[in-house]
Regions:
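Substrate-binding/charge-relay-adjacent region of secreted/lumenal peptidase catalytic domains
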Residues: 1-86, 90-123, 172-230, 253-255, ...
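A short, structural micro-pattern
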Residues: 37, 115-118, 143, 154, ...
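Active-site-proximal beta-strand/loop segments in catalytic clefts of secreted hydrolases
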Residues: 45-50, 79-83, 124-129, 146-157, ...
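Short, electropositive, low-hydrophobicity segments enriched in small/polar residues
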Residues: 85-88, 129-130, 237, 241, ...
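Polar, glycine-rich mid-to-C-terminal structural blocks
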Residues: 119, 123-176
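An often Trp-containing, charged/polar helix-loop segment at the C-terminal end
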Residues: 132, 153-155, 185, 200, ...
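C-terminal substrate/ligand-recognition segments
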Residues: 211, 232-251
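Basic/polar, cationic surfaces and motifs that engage anionic cell-wall
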Residues: 290-294, 306-311
Length: 319
């Protein structure tokens, strides 16, 4: 993160507060480029970790750093994760309902992901082509329609079920830009959410909901050790969305407009740029489904998957 800011954001010189910069001691920040290079205009993060594993002070401090980047015209995009309502490696774990701490088990209360829980980044969930979808001209042409469903994949080696991560932060309140969307989802899913709450899986903390958007998370072809293979997950979704934003930034720069920076208020202000994903859900902590994909924003696929041309039309006019 240090490399993304100019020197005025490098912080204090008190080593008990911030690292000394520049620092000539072994392991110091001698080689960092804080203040020496122009920061990238889009940052894509294919990483997620249990929010509960970090202190509130760390989460808030780091989230403010993301906000600073947004104010500098840098868009920060992160994959929501592939472990549904669990978080961590090997399919993820859940929270102890009694303590709220990591239970190191696959049952209990939903465990939100970091950094997707930060309201100042754009979280990207996962979709896939509907397995049983019949070709439909209407689906191909109707504004906002989708032949996608929420991402779900069973690992061929570990036999673990992976689904698009989504849920609600236990540390950050829902920001103003998404309150109406989150409220509509909770109202639409009231009966289901009440069952999840009664079973100890979910507690309505009024937290920031994620993901914000979603994109294809299946069948990415890569070369591994000289052989072609396919991979799955939102670690592919996030950089594809980041590429779209980079292209839109280029179009804005041609018009002498600034880069977009923090995206979310503009995305939530108009859902017309997205294909609404209403099929599927995610899983975790003994709940199947956990959260469901629904019309409008949902805690599985967010606002839906972007249509590039419509997204360009929306974001090219942002001041």
């Amino acid at each position: 993160m240090l490399a993304a800011f100019d020197k005025f954001y490098c912080g204090a010189l008190d080593p008990s507060v911030d690292a000394i910069y520049p620092d000539s001691r072994p392991g110091g920040y001698n080689g960092s480029d804080c203040g020496t290079v122009t920061p990238p205009k889009v940052v894509s993060i294919s990483f997620s970790w249990p929010e509960v594993d970090f202190s509130s002070s760390y989460l808030e401090r780091q989230c403010l750093e993301f906000l600073k980047l947004g104010l500098m015209g840098v868009t920060v995009i992160a994959s929501s994760g592939d472990t549904g309502t669990q978080s961590g490696i090997s399919g993820g774990t859940c929270l102890d309902p009694a303590t709220g701490h990591n239970a190191t088990s696959k049952t209990g209360r939903f465990s939100p992901q970091w950094p997707s829980s930060c309201p100042w980044i754009t979280s990207v969930g996962g979709t896939q082509k509907q397995r049983a979808a019949a070709p439909s001209k209407a689906n191909n042409t109707e504004l906002g329609s989708s032949r996608e469903e929420a991402f779900r994949y069973i690992g061929s080696i570990d036999n673990v079920t992976y689904t698009s991560s989504g849920g609600f932060s236990n540390n950050f309140a829902a920001p103003a830009y998404q309150r109406d969307a989150v409220s509509a989802y909770k109202q639409l899913q009231g009966e289901h959410l009440s069952r999840l709450e009664a079973s100890g899986h979910y507690a309505d903390s009024g937290g920031r909901g994620y993901p914000d958007v979603s994109l294809l998370a299946s069948s990415y072809v890569i070369s591994l050790y000289g052989r072609l293979t396919s991979i799955y997950g939102t670690s592919g979704s996030a950089p594809v969305f980041a590429s779209m934003i980079t292209l839109i930034n280029n179009e804005r720069l041609k018009l002498s407009k600034p880069t977009l920076g923090f995206l979310n208020p503009a995305l939530y202000a108009s859902s017309q740029a997205f294909n609404d994903v209403v099929v599927g859900g995610n899983e975790g902590c003994g709940a199947e489904p956990a959260f469901k994909a629904t019309p409008g924003w949902d805690a599985v696929t967010g606002l839906g998957s972007p249509d590039y041309e419509r997204l360009l039309g929306l974001l090219i006019d942002v001041p």
